[in-house]
Amino acid sequence: FFAAPWSPPAWMKSSEKIIGGTLKKGYEKQLAIYLRKFIEAYERQGIPIYAISTQNEPNFVPDNYPGMQLSAKQQLDLTIATYEEFHNPNKPELYTKIWLNDHNFEDWVNADFILKELKKIGKEYYVSGTAFHNYTNYPASYMSQLYNNHPDHEIIFTEHSEWGISGMYNIQKYFWNWSRSYMYWVTMTTYDL
């Protein structure tokens, strides 16, 4: 299993709601502790979490369901806090991988920025990969651009919906551009199926 939070608790957010807003300044450590507790709770139920992204779709703020915007700098700070919480010497170590971005192809520039900043401070190993969605018309080749800049980091395709047979060609494009996975998002809209 992998996990992607849509929103932290309202008290951590500028909107004071799980819908909208961004992470309050200085709350990165609190959110990292929250993510640790989530992973530990699932593990107690026999469900290990292989990887987690720090935020689902960090560049999109839905107005009618939970979500949160995070700038690339906020994602960087949260990623550092999360890794350091998972590997806190005073707590049991968590081996859950951390994935960046978890958003559309054009957002590869945010992941590139974060990975370059981590490399500058010798912490590029804090992240194992970058997760992508495909809900815009930008090319899957952006995943290859990121891979070419950071070949030691995985590319993971974590979310998309396809209609009809066009989906097969898109899935091929994802793998041609270094994705190690494909996750199909399906929402049931009727009980009549």
Task: Enumerate the language-model features and the residues they cover.
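Substrate-binding cleft and catalytic face of glycoside hydrolase catalytic domains
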Residues: F1-K119, Y135
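Alpha-helix termination/capping residues and helix-transition junctions
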Residues: R44-G46, K120-E124, N149, W176
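Glycine/Thr-rich phosphate-binding loops of Rossmann-like dinucleotide-binding domains
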Residues: P62, A140, D192
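Glycoside hydrolase catalytic-domain groove-lining segments
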Residues: I80, E84-I98, E124-N170
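Mature extracellular/periplasmic domains of secretome proteins
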Residues: I114-K120, L146-Y147, N170-Y174
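Aromatic/acidic polysaccharide-binding cleft in carbohydrate-active enzymes
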Residues: F157-L193
